[in-house]
Amino acid sequence: MSFEKSVGAVVFRKEEDEVFFLLLHYISGHWDFPKGHVEEGESEHETLRREVQEETGIRDLGIISGFKRNIFYSYRPGGKEREKKKGVAHIIKKVVYYAAETESVEIGLSHEHKGFEWLPYDEAIGRITHDNGKNILLKANIFLKKKK
């Protein structure tokens, strides 16, 4: 068994009185938030900024203090990952999520994605593929409403 840590961002923007959340359509078919592995020597905030910029081109992120949530899941490595991690049958993954605001609307997608959407909460919660992501969005939405 192996352990991995990633950092993700619930990226949102405000337009008048409405909040729009950024969801990425991954090549594998699922919809989720930008996220990625922590590189050696990086802080969580550095990872968040790097991953969001690499995956979307967004540079003007304001990380919202007070929102930090963790999810855990396990999976079996496949394909190239299986070759790199010979002998590892199971990976336990921790993803730390932050909320981050942007004023950017245009996105420069990375090769990892085939699309994106800026969606209001009610549509975003239905679009996210995995229950962990839905739960993070629910918590972020509640947090942002209280912060108004």
Regions found by a protein language model. Give the residues of each.
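Residue-level signal for short segments within beta-strands and strand-turn junctions
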Residues: 11-13, 25-26, 101-102
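NUDIX/MutT-family hydrolases
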Residues: 96-101, 106-138
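C-terminal alpha-helix
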Residues: 139-146
